[in-house]
Design a protein with these regions (language model features):
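Conserved phosphate- and dinucleotide-binding cores of soluble alpha/beta proteins
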Residues: 32, 36-170
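Active-site catalytic pocket residues across diverse enzymes, especially alpha/beta-hydrolases
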Residues: 21-26, 42, 46
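Helix-turn-helix/homeodomain-like alpha-helical modules used for DNA recognition
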Residues: 1-24, 31-34
């Protein structure tokens, strides 16, 4: 993500770690998020504009979801979407547990020019109930370990670049 970019940041602890790294490394970002913790982390920067989506806050993780959230996200067109999900199957299916969160994530995908997916290795072949979409909707996958040969094949077939990310600094 370059300086001066606009971006969506989705729900999840992975996205909170990404937000902390952005704060350390990037300037003048415009961030729209449905993650109250990512908003809190990034709002510490006076050169950032941080916009929090409207909707219902989930007590468990501070995620904001619902119809109002989807409508809010659909008002924007950003440079990047940085997202995570609960599971990726070898056929490229992206899965999550909350259908309300999935609708918000789909709106983010549809309103971003470049889409990044960040997941740790535990998300590969992890089951979840709701289908978010296909990995082919993303431009690049960032993860902490090399994906399996089957997953690499799917990524290559869909034209999705992938990278093992450097560990998050503390």
């Amino acid at each position: 993500i370059p300086d001066n970019a606009s971006l969506f940041i989705s729900i999840g602890t992975t996205m909170e770690a990404v937000a902390a790294e952005l704060v350390r490394q990037r300037k003048n970002l415009r961030i729209i998020t449905n993650n109250i913790y990512a908003a809190s982390i990034t709002a510490a920067r006076t050169d950032y504009t941080v916009i929090i989506a409207s909707g219902v806050v989930r007590p468990l993780d501070g995620g904001i979801t619902g119809v109002a959230t989807v409508d809010f996200i659909n008002q924007f067109k950003v440079d990047y979407a940085i997202m995570s999900t609960h599971g990726i199957e070898n056929d490229g299916s992206l899965l999550d547990d909350d259908y309300k969160e999935v609708s918000v994530m789909q709106a983010m995908v549809n309103n971003a020019r470049v889409r990044y997916l960040g997941v740790d290795h535990s998300k590969f072949n992890s089951n979840a109930l709701v289908r978010l979409g296909d990995i082919g909707a993303f431009d690049k996958l960032f993860t902490d370990r090399t994906p399996s040969a089957a997953m690499q094949k799917t990524l290559n077939e869909r034209g999705v670049a992938w990278q093992v990310a450097d560990p998050v600094s503390k």
